[in-house]
Amino acid sequence: YHKELKECEIRIAVYRDPIDKIISGFYYCQEFKPGLNSLDHFLDTYPQQLKDNYIRIHCRTNTDMLGPDPSIYTHVYNMRDIDTKLLPFLEQLGGKKIQKTRLREHGTRTITEAQEAKAREVMAIDYKNGWCKELISSKI
């Protein structure tokens, strides 16, 4: 895939902060998977949880979805910047107006420090590869 991607003149990636991604993914999947009732258990059994395709689609790492090297992309956007940065770029590129994104709304989700630490551990590959807001600007 790396070779095919390199052949493209414009290569766009949209990533999500790893902690936000896994926590949001858990709560989204929880709506459709009645057995998911504990974030702690989910984080402790993360590799086994990914065997469920529905959960894998929503909770896998940015690295798994986008590859290990953000610098292969010509344009990298944080999901939070879709409307303010990516949309204007695509409108300029295509010459047409594009509808803004409509993200699902939910109440504030609070997690414990231990859960955040475990989520960071589970998503460590994204921090190593730079798929996080702390490192992305230095990788591209």
Regions found by a protein language model. Name each.
Residues 1-118, 122-125:
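PAPS-dependent sulfotransferase catalytic domain
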Residues 120-140:
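Long, positively charged, glycine-interspersed low-complexity recognition regions
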